[in-house]
């Protein structure tokens, strides 16, 4: 079993954290928008937050995906193969959501001497620890042809298992700042996903928007396809991730585990839901 280190992450930087093991219902759009709602709360002085959540089936794309499609002309698609298409605020490229996919989000105040690498390590270390407990060694790396490819993919046995992205908003979250900001990092872990089906969905989207089919099914894998992973499911991975975090935090760090965001965050998520529509993102107004 691989042992992971925590000293090179941000987990000890703040004395209090919030762990959201989300159970409250919501639309696809509201669940996506809740990441930014958490950012608003953290920027205003709320505790840094780690969120574990699952969404209904859809494809979630980045603003970059929308812009690239606009360059070819035509309206951005709102669905592909019957799956809704929605837009997130962080970077990267398209990823599938659904009952076999674990979403994990990290929101911390924007502070001095915090870098992108630290943020990615902080986001992924709990998941990396869970995989290590199950005998799978995960590491960062690019995998050509994988979904949402980047240097901070989580890779097991040469295949991508999780994609990540980041978004930095506002200025430093310090007293007196007029534009207190936050850092949002997001991960998508394939727990029970058919790589062939997922690649078809992603390629159908990209064929409509950029005229290409860049995703290779064999570049990525799912936990249930790894040796010893046959019976794994998302609920198990959520529970194990929460337990890993609670065990890893020393006495100097308080981790508050909750099952829901605040009412204010839920309200902000509803307000921000319309901002996930591809055509609203493309044109700045609602379009049919």
UniProtKB/Swiss-Prot annotation:
Record domain BPL/LPL catalytic: where: 44-253
Encoding gene, per UniProt annotation: lipL
Family assignment from sequence similarity: Belongs to the octanoyltransferase LipL family.
Enzyme class: transferase
Name of the protein described by the UniProt record: Octanoyl-[GcvH]:protein N-octanoyltransferase
Residue segments, region Disordered: 269-288
EC number: 2.3.1.204
Gene Ontology annotations of biological process type: lipoate biosynthetic process; protein modification process
Function in brief: Catalyzes the amidotransfer (transamidation) of the octanoyl moiety from octanoyl-GcvH to the lipoyl domain of the E2 subunit of lipoate-dependent enzymes.
Pathway: Protein modification; protein lipoylation via endogenous pathway; protein N(6)-(lipoyl)lysine from octanoyl-[acyl-carrier-protein]
GO molecular function: lipoyl(octanoyl) transferase activity
Keywords: Acyltransferase, Transferase
Pfam families (UniProt xref): LplA-B_cat
Reaction equations catalysed: N(6)-octanoyl-L-lysyl-[glycine-cleavage complex H protein] + L-lysyl-[lipoyl-carrier protein] = N(6)-octanoyl-L-lysyl-[lipoyl-carrier protein] + L-lysyl-[glycine-cleavage complex H protein]
Site positions (Lowers pKa of active site Cys): 160
Matching PROSITE patterns: BPL_LPL_CATALYTIC
Biased composition (Basic and acidic residues): 272-288
Further information: The reaction proceeds via a thioester-linked acyl-enzyme intermediate.
InterPro entries cross-referenced by the UniProt entry: aa-tRNA-synth_II/BPL/LPL, BPL_LPL_catalytic, LipL, Octanoyltrans_LipM/LipL
Active-site residues, as the UniProt record annotates them: 148 (acyl-thioester intermediate)
């Amino acid at each position: 079993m691989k042992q992971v280190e925590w000293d090179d992450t941000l987990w000890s930087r703040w004395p209090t954290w919030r762990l959201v093991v989300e159970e409250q219902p919501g639309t696809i759009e509201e669940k996506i928008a809740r990441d930014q709602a958490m950012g608003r709360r953290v920027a205003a002085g709320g505790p840094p937050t780690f969120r574990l959540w699952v969404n209904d089936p859809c494809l979630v794309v980045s603003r970059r995906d929308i812009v690239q499609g606009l360059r070819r002309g035509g309206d951005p698609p709102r669905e592909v193969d019957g799956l809704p298409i929605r837009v997130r605020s962080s970077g990267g490229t398209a990823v599938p959501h659904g009952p076999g996919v674990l979403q994990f989000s990290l929101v911390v105040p924007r502070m001095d001497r915090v870098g992108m690498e630290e943020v990615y390590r902080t986001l992924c270390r709990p998941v990396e620890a869970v995989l290590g407990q199950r005998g799978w060694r995960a590491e960062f790396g690019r995998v050509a042809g994988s979904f949402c490819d980047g240097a901070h993919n989580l890779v097991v046995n040469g295949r991508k298992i999780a994609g990540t992205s980041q978004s930095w908003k506002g200025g430093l979250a310090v007293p007196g700042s007029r534009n207190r900001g936050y850092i949002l990092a997001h991960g998508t872990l394939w727990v029970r996903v058919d790589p062939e089906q997922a690649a078809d969905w992603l390629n159908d989207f990209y064929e409509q928007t950029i005229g290409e089919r860049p995703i290779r099914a064999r570049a990525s894998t799912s936990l249930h396809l790894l040796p010893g992973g046959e019976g794994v499911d998302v609920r198990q991975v959520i529970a194990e991730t929460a337990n890993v975090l609670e065990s890893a935090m020393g006495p100097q760090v308080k981790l508050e585990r909750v099952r829901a965001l605040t009412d204010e965050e839920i309200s902000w998520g509803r307000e921000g839901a319309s901002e996930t529509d591809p055509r609203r993102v493309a044109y700045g107004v609602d379009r049919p």
